[in-house]
Amino acid sequence: NKIKITATSTGKVPNTSATAASSGSDLNGMAAKNAAEKIKSRMAEYLAAEAQIKPNEVSFEDGKVLVGANDYNFSDAVKRCYMGRISLSATGFYSTPKVHWNPKTLKGRPFYYFAYGAACSEVVVDLLTGENRILRTDILHDVGKSLNPAIDIGQIEGGYVQGAGWLTTEELVWDDRGRLLTHAPSTYKIPACSDRPLDFRVKLFSEGENCEETIHRSKAVGEPPLMLGTSVLMALSHALQAVNARKAYPNLNACLLYTSPSP
């Protein structure tokens, strides 16, 4: 109740970035932490000087500030600093460390960390019409120490369904002049709610913990689940293989580029 987050605005925060992709907690969260640590340091220095102790003897715990023998509510400690003319605002900044890449040698570290996931999908296919359904999907995903399990599970479900649609119903079609015809959801098929697995089971890896420094050792999971949609493509291929006594896997040509609409 004591923390309020406003809409992103360069009128309030210069050079701000949007909350998109997998940047919410990793970038914006760490920048907010950086700003909070600056204010915390100022408060500790002022309160320590007031009590004639060292700043490292000031601790912030459970809504309280312990200053030597004194025990203040956080709001009271803030008021003391305010009356002492201590700045209680700060700008935080964070850029992902350890990331580097050489496009010439194709070597480096393009990612700060990895979020791992596994999916198993069961499908049914009408061999006469090609109509198919996802009967069941089981997913286990690593999210580090989850900040909000409900949000993480929702991200995983959405990313998976998007990936399944990318590999089964979306199609890139150009005309003879090279213009993209399927340029928006109005011109290509995206998954609907009815296309999600009839039995959808998602679990978070309970023993996960980010080895890199992030907010509470969490991991972003906005984009990684997209690739789990490949389990649907492989399941469809496996189902079609049954027609040929499992002698060979058929090539489904997922994500190929076409110059004219399919018949």
Protein language model annotation of sequence segments:
Residues N1-S260:
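C-terminal catalytic domains of large/alpha subunits in multi-subunit enzymes
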